[in-house]
Amino acid sequence: MTKTVPPKTPAYEDTVGCQIALFEWAESYDTKDWGRLAKCIAPTLRIDYRNVIGKLWEAMPADEFLAMASSEKFLGNARIKTQHFVGAGKLVQTHEDRITGYHQMRVAHQRYSDDALTEVLYTGHGHGKATVQFCLVDGVWKFAGLEPEIRWAENDLEKIFE
């Protein structure tokens, strides 16, 4: 049973654990390393993409999240390159095994016209914040949810995933 605690700053070790999970998530997205992504995510995730594609999943199983992220219609498309740059952030511990992170984000995107990645078709960059959920699973902090908030975008962000 999860014990509720008043929101507080997490202990140093817990903060580092969440930073590791966040780094692994971002790097796995950008390198398209789906095995690496599988290792850093929780068994169930809360994915709130209402701000991006109008959808919310309160409890998405890890295998469905992996399938969505690696889909040809999303980040699995070899012609799409990204960099998920995480800026300043703060962490709040809401339960003994739950932490919420609030992070500045800039996500750069390029879509290429060919498989050899010789010609950039579109570029688009999103700027804003991500609310990230973390949960403790067998003593390891895992990426457990995401809610991006795009405050503004550059270039043709809306065309990247067409």
Swiss-Prot record:
It holds the Pfam family Scytalone_dh. Substrate binds at residues 29, 49. It comes from the Eukaryota. Disulfide bonds: none annotated. One of its GO terms (biological process) is melanin metabolic process. The active site is at residues 84, 109. Keywords: Lyase. The keyword Lyase applies. InterPro entries: NTF2-like_dom_sf (IPR032710), Scytalone_dehydratase (IPR004235), Scytalone_dh (IPR049884). GO terms for molecular function: scytalone dehydratase activity. The keyword Lyase applies. Its EC number is 4.2.1.-. Pathway: Secondary metabolite biosynthesis. Belongs to the scytalone dehydratase family. Scytalone dehydratase-like protein; part of the gene cluster that mediates the biosynthesis of the tetrahydroxanthone dimer neosartorin, which exhibits antibacterial activity. The two different monomeric units appear to be synthesized by the same set of enzymes, among which the Baeyer-Villiger monooxygenase nsrF is the key enzyme for the divergence of the biosynthetic routes. The pathway begins with the synthesis of atrochrysone thioester by the polyketide synthase nsrB. This is Scytalone dehydratase-like protein nsrI. The lineage of its organism: Eukaryota, Fungi, Dikarya, Ascomycota, Pezizomycotina.
